């Protein structure tokens, strides 16, 4: 997830600046945000639904911390979305605002770690990152709407998050009801294969949901370039 975000960042920043003066640039930025969210959701689910396989790769000594992986993935997803919405202060020349937004995130991270880490250990650090990026994202989005309004479709983005949450929830419900105790490496191969196949079906459902939610948006993005 972090690798994809860094790749996107290096490619997107010149892309945004190059089109800043175009008539349909703001609409294009909004559509880019939607596809970015959908692709990050794919990465998140690609790891979450096949977490058993990744657990085999990293070894037994580190499996106790696998539970925080989805939290960290969501955190990095928010970080990437923060990069998208924070382009406003670069495009509007208000880069000094970045300092205050970053400080707000630092305060949240510090407070969560100081208060909760003694009791919850690395879980506090994971949720501290999540809370920090969420606060920074909200602040940046609110300020961006004031100083450099971009017509983000928050309903569509929210629907993508609901879709991601629904797929995660269905997979956990299915695992508890049908595959309790089934794990790669310690269970019969047939049970693991069936479990992973059903998870693949859920991933296909996510694809279908994204196709429905983003229908026509790619053509609209191309139209802004004309």
What do these predicted ranges mean?
Residues 34-42, 74, 78, 163-167:
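Hydrophobic alpha-helical transmembrane segments of multipass membrane transporters and ion channels
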Residues 50-52, 58-63, 93, 116-120, ...:
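Short helix-capping/hinge motifs at transmembrane helix termini and TM-loop junctions
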Residues 30, 47-77, 83, 182-190:
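Interfacial segments at transmembrane-helix termini and the short loops linking adjacent helices
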Residues 105-108, 155-221:
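Transmembrane alpha-helical segments of multi-pass transport proteins
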Residues 6-9, 67-117, 122-146, 199-204:
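Short runs within selected transmembrane alpha-helices of multi-pass transporters and secretion channels
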Residues 1-34, 86-91:
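Helix-loop junctions and terminal segments of transmembrane helices
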Residues 3, 44-52, 71, 110, ...:
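Membrane-embedded alpha-helical segments of multi-pass transporters/permeases
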